[in-house]
């Protein structure tokens, strides 16, 4: 149905309506298998599925139900609605935008808001209405994007797309050109159609009786695996069936689980060995000590910067000293389950204290002296300990803490200064002056265990996590978990008594328990570093290597510190277990580059799950260098360890496990969960849940009746911990985390509850409203940003500042005093890591249509805004108080700390957003600036500008001065800007050209040919020789003599089977070199050439895909200038110049091609002046051809007649099959046969037979226009890359289609890991870099070429103006030729028979030494 075009006024009104419809639009992305490439790249693939009978029946049932409710629907409406539901389930978004089109194939955006509680019929009705509304208000897609971009502020990035997901009725879909033009930023396009037996597409908008319904999913292989797309199709069909069963039920509860998914996902009903208690960790340790008392247990190391011996403690010494403390606790009334608080430091005494508390049957908890006293008091108030153990080396308690302990706690005992001496003797300190050591009375019991029995449900640990009301939560651990998983881990990760573990975790964080208990369980060693070795970047790696550590537990932040500025490898390290925060691919790579043998194990869990965690292994680079290439930037959480399940549960209907890709909440189901929260039964009941999936009566309790610990076993409890994390299942069954269901987050390993920060902020008297978010800065680092609306301020509270147009900068300036005050206030309430790095004052909070704070609309200050605010601060009085050194240091801080706004000389580097990683960068910036060897640990001891400046001044003037040797810069050949060089070279081309004559077909002609003995040159020569008896060819050949030159030419022709002895009479040779002046031809011969030559075919060039422009400039550019010079002298001559489509190898021309073809054009016009590639060409060869073309076209303006011939890939002869084995595509063919795989790349390939290209070149020489024109040589039709390589299996070669990412990884393994001499090795950089993008070519208009070939048909009696192509027949011919010459093996599988080719012995003999010009890998 045609529609009348709207008036300009109506059209603008439509654009305004669309602008309103798409306001604050959420553009959803589907979950991917691979990281999104930046910038966007596309490797298209297609997956097709025919609807099964149950899905077709379900469509009819929905249709009938909708009709009964008066909803006029079509099958397409139903499927579109199903797709919207699936997208919402995959993304968690409630604002869904899908690209679709009207019945007139006009694309538009269908945007709908969706709630899980919506009924299917209600949503279906809404979608139908929105589809009608969008169809009737159609506008051009590009016009809409331009209209929306025109409304953006200068700070906003322009929109490139309006949707990432598209769903079309195939007959109504926009043109294929539109789909490809707009496809770069699209995740998935679904085309739905009905196929009749006639194979004609039938619309889904009108009928329900159909034989076959087809889904065609077009997806980006750089984002999705085929298995993922297969599952998406399954889920789409499953949702159709589910909806048909309950059209009025909530869409959030629709089942999308399929048998395929169930095979890889955990079964939430299985027995997880609930009664499999392994024993208490302290008893296992005591048993180990009895078995091997003299084995090394704890090794305390000195700093690597000093030469001192280690202090080593045996299992007996740790066992005996912990017995002493345990007996002291028991004799002072400590009972099973009492909390003993340990004021600790990282060292052997902590191990003694922990094991002593456990042996007493008590619960240990740790306070870190680094916490502010107020925070320590909070921990004490929550724990209510009955004993306090202070480690002597941890320092003394703060007076305020001591006062709290004395007034508020009822301690049974207090150990003031626990210390294990180097000889193994233990002291506890004296509680009063002159009194005996507090442990004196139990020293005689050191060899005796306490005998206190604990069971799986006894409480060994009390660990703290962030709380929502400003009060930390105390998590009560259980003994079950502490030892249960170690046997499995030892087997799975090859851990043993020979290992040397590290003690690197934060002492008050529960990961420290892994550090201690793992080696003690295994009978291994625990190596303890100094604080200096941990805190000084680069030093920790030295320490790890020096002491040959083999296993470590790290947070990602600690891993970054280990790898930062490290240059000493750690070959001994074989496993690194990461916990506590998201682990990135970059984190893994940094560590694995340092430790080539380390397997990185990402472990997902929480304090509440104790040792019950998931795991995902990144194998060592010594085993698999390519593994990380297929991983996304964030490493998955993986799957549960032995008898641990990660259940991703539907948030709307918790009775359902989520399908693969569906976002849900992560629950951990295991027997090793913690007991709950101390003193908070209500929260415990919300987070530790009895499983509703299984019948507990079917589980068997295998606890022995006589087990002494049975009284401390609560029986089988099938429990799950509700993590609050959002996640998804991957197609493998692994889980990836995708955010938080609440506001709890982790930054640098610390778990932070945003609610806690918001609570404290809201209590500040000058804060009316506030919200805290996590944003990613320009380096993708998570950053805490607090937004506040100030209140109750006086004029004196405002900082004077010059007004700026930027409201963010104004706020940061105006409220600087308030920001500083809030920061100081939060320091008294929160640990430093929980204080927002950026505080942004606002006049009011932006609200969304639902009346909630519009989080996406909150401004995130960028670097320039923060710098502007800081500059303003500097201008208003700060500079006057800073020395020159201090000013320089401040400037460095502002440059490297992304969000520093309140920088003064006394501010701590770490308080304003610095951390250990940035500290490393700071030190090197200081070294570079001041040319002194600033110690790497200086910022930790002097974290202020003032302190750093004093130390640097001292170094500059004193003994420590050490000018840095920054080395000499490598001498480089200066780069030449090819576009500018072309302009400069115009002066070298002749000022004018004599007019060439149009000779008749029978008139004598002399052709000068360069590159005659190259691959294409051979076929150009053959084409010339078969044209006329009155034609002579003078060939330029690089040789020692004319005789030698003729032999070389003859050998090349013979090698490709084209030589005819009769040619010798019509061919003469001149010796020369393209790079030399006049090609090195002696003057007499040069002068003769100017008088006898009628046509110049300049085909010669140095083809190399790595050489820079500067190396190719001589033969390719200066050689072309020589050709122009020859044309300008003597008689008039026309020029046929062989260029390459590598001159249009830029994104500009790909986009221009898409734009032209989307409007019905044929592609890049031959008249285009190529300014779109005057920069951004990436190969020196393409650049040299661009400059040469430019000069030839300039010569055309000065009278030259000629044609620039622009071919793409030049493949074999369509008659004989002879082909250049050094061609890129031929190497691809051989490489894929070697690998047994070929990549699924959907790009079209512009490849043409060599004989057709030769015909275009010669025809262009004989039929030039006035001036210089371009003749594109393009394939008609073009095969796609996967079709081209797919012919291998057609003809019986053992190759299989592979997803591109998998093919790329397999190739890299094949070439690098297995050291195979692949045919692709010389081009590996090109293939592995980005083959799909490198092979993506613009479409080309070839009008000029067609006209030239039509004119030439009267000379040759053969009309080839319709072009040529390489299809299955030609590929068979080429493959047969390559087999015949021994380049390829014979096919081994059944397939089409290769056509017969005839190759004589002379050809085989000469082939080995033939010169060749390969087809361009850049077209």
Curated annotation (Swiss-Prot):
Q: Pathway, according to UniProt?
A: Amino-acid biosynthesis; L-lysine biosynthesis via AAA pathway; L-lysine from L-alpha-aminoadipate (fungal route): step 1/3
Gene Ontology cellular component annotations, sorted alphabetically: cytosol
- Molecular function terms in GO for this entry? L-aminoadipate-semialdehyde dehydrogenase activity; phosphopantetheine binding
What's in the keyword line of the UniProt record?
Answer: Amino-acid biosynthesis, Cytoplasm, Lysine biosynthesis, NADP, Oxidoreductase, Phosphopantetheine, Phosphoprotein
The record's listing under SMART domains reads: PKS_PP
Q: Its biological function?
A: Catalyzes the activation of alpha-aminoadipate by ATP-dependent adenylation and the reduction of activated alpha-aminoadipate by NADPH. The activated alpha-aminoadipate is bound to the phosphopantheinyl group of the enzyme itself before it is reduced to (S)-2-amino-6-oxohexanoate.
Which protein are we looking at? Answer: L-2-aminoadipate reductase
Organism per entry: Schizosaccharomyces pombe (strain 972 / ATCC 24843) (Fission yeast)
